[in-house]
Amino acid sequence: MTTLLLAMTTTLALAAPTEKPAIIVEGEQPPARITRAAVLTPTEGPPVVLYSAVNQTDQQLEQFTVMAFVFKADGTPRARQVAPGRRTLEPHETKYSTIVLDAGLVDPTDIIVIGIDGIQRAGSETWWHAELRPLAEKAVPVKKH
């Protein structure tokens, strides 16, 4: 029994995903923001960014979209991906969600940048929007050759 337990524990430890922080960017005066983002790389399948988003307002937010950028270690853009975030963020509420980075190959040395690019308040057709690409490019540390 002890051998079986040890084998199962070892298997779980070896199958655990690796984790590294993602760089977070945001536009001016966002109604919601990402407060933490971690890139989880499983032994099989594409990396996943686990993030927390918090509503910074006293109003309900109907929906938001998240944009993730993948840069090579030298700062060269590799991919961009957009996904819907969680629906309905109550005032000052924090929710957790994920974005699967399956738009292309992601190397372990790649740099992941994430931010909220669009937010719609409840009862409104108007969206708050941020142009994240220049912010993402500026946030990536460029390695000099």
Each language-model region and where it sits:
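Terminal connector regions
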Residues: E19-I23, D102-H145
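Short acidic/proline- and small/hydrophobic-mixed sequence motifs that coincide with surface turns
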Residues: Q59-Q63, R78
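Bacterial N-terminal signal peptides
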Residues: M1-A13
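Short aromatic-acidic-glycine turn motif
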Residues: V70-R80
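Asparagine-centered strand-capping/turn motif at beta-strand->loop junctions
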Residues: A53-T57
